[in-house]
């Protein structure tokens, strides 16, 4: 029976829009193969293997389950007000974070992602959304953006935040709030990551505290 890479199979089955999107799903821990969490895009799978992507928001309201990450953060950070703000969503993917910003009254949102064609149609077609695809966040410059954001959110994979913070700071308005998701598996270095998950509490703490 023919075997394929997991990221390619996700695209073939219509579970991901591109291999880039598939890799993001896998590294986010939302792809199950035969009931187990897959952690590597290169994992070999067969056509008969049961593959499930659990990213979809179970309520059916948000374009991705990732929206709830930002909802939780904004509910916790009560002093971060979205209404009327010029926002940048770094690593927008399907647009869960962008959707939350829109629903909370953002004036405009610039959705930035290295991939292409991932942003969900209801989000993409909102008049307040500017889409910047095929763009590595590390290469952002203020002159290339339609505005300088005063609220910046990020959910990035495959790269430590310390490598993108200089670019984000360079495009931000003089007064800007940043709400950034920290993913320890991309912060502590490959040697400290076993099966794709950082299990040591001290390492997880160091990823957050620096």
Go through each PLM region and give its residues.
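Conserved alpha-helix/loop element of class I SAM-dependent methyltransferases that forms part
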Residues: 66-83
């Amino acid at each position: 029976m023919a075997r394929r890479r997991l990221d390619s199979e996700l695209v073939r089955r219509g579970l991901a829009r591109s291999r880039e999107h598939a890799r993001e799903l896998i590294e986010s821990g939302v792809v199950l193969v035969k009931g187990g969490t897959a952690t590597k895009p290169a994992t070999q799978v067969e056509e008969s293997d049961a593959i499930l992507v659990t990213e979809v928001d179970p309520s059916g309201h948000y374009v991705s389950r990732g929206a709830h990450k930002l909802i939780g953060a904004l509910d916790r950070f009560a002093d971060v007000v979205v209404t009327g703000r010029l926002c940048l969503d770094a690593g927008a993917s399907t647009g869960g974070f962008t959707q939350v910003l829109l629903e909370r009254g953002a004036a405009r949102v610039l959705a930035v992602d290295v991939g292409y064609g991932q942003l969900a149609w209801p989000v993409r077609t909102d008049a307040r959304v500017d889409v910047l695809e095929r763009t590595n966040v590390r290469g952002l410059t203020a002159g290339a953006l339609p505005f300088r954001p005063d609220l910046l959110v990020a959910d990035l994979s495959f790269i430590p935040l310390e490598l993108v913070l200089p670019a984000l700071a360079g495009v931000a308005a003089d007064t800007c709030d940043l709400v950034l998701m920290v993913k320890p598996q991309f912060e502590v270095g490959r040697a400290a990551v076993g099966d794709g998950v950082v299990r040591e509490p001290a390492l997880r703490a160091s990823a957050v505290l620096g």
